[in-house]
Amino acid sequence: MTDHVKAGPGGVMTDEVGVITGDVTLTTEPAADGTASVRIQYTGAEEWYTLTGSPAPLPPGGLAVFHQHVVEAVEAGGAAEVPDTLS
């Protein structure tokens, strides 16, 4: 799943380059082991980064619920990471 969003104040934390801010594109991809990975990039850029906390276990609601929680965290900002508790 992919969405284009504006990172909230304080941006989002990536493993590779630290905090990124502004307009970003994020994508969540499920894995066979019941986890999902989250990658993020500046919208229109070529480089993708790993959102800190990824991969993470999928919640009972599956990928759509996981993706929505991540979108909400990114929109909230504050050096957002993949939320620890997804239920």
Q: How should each PLM-predicted stretch be described?
A:
Residues 1-27:
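Negatively charged, low-complexity tracts enriched in Asp/Glu with abundant Ser/Thr
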Residues 5-9, 19, 44-47, 51, ...:
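Generic alpha-helix detector with strongest preference for long hydrophobic helices that associate
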Residues 28, 36, 40, 67-74:
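Amphipathic alpha-helical interface segments used for dimerization/assembly
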Residues 32-49:
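A short, structured beta-strand/loop element
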Residues 47-49, 55-87:
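Mixed-charge, Lys/Arg-enriched low-complexity segments
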